[in-house]
Amino acid sequence: MVKSELLTPRGLRTLAPKNIHYEGTYEGDQATRDHAYHQGTVWPWLIGPYIEANFRLYGKEFVKTAKELLAGFEEDMTVYGVCSVGEIYDGNPPYAPNGCISQAWSVGEILRSMAMIRKYEKAKK
């Protein structure tokens, strides 16, 4: 379910699109944005625990997929927040960045994920 309903190119959604409370975009006045904040927005920092869990399940076989997941952030790091990623993203494509322009824990999880990839690339089969 996580892969099919929550995973996006920018991290994991906080709520599946099939849920009746799902809000696919983070826009509008403050009250509307506050309501949408945990109702389907994508949180980039959740990519770290997702990658870690998959490495524990699949080991080295997950390296290619992990690299593909992180590649989704490369363009954003040169456009929205230079060398950083946004706090949250819309749950619907094209997954527009929102919230603060730079989120330390999201960057930290991307860096931690990169370190996990290097570790598993060096690991014996």
Where are the regions a protein language model picked out?
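Extended glycan-interaction surfaces of carbohydrate-active proteins
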Residues: M1-W43, A71-K125
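Short glycine/serine- and small hydrophobic-enriched flexible loop segments
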Residues: G48-R56, R112-M116
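Alpha-helical support elements that line or immediately flank enzyme active sites
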Residues: I51-K60, A66, L70
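Short linear motifs at secondary-structure transitions and domain/linker junctions
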Residues: K60-F62, E87-I88
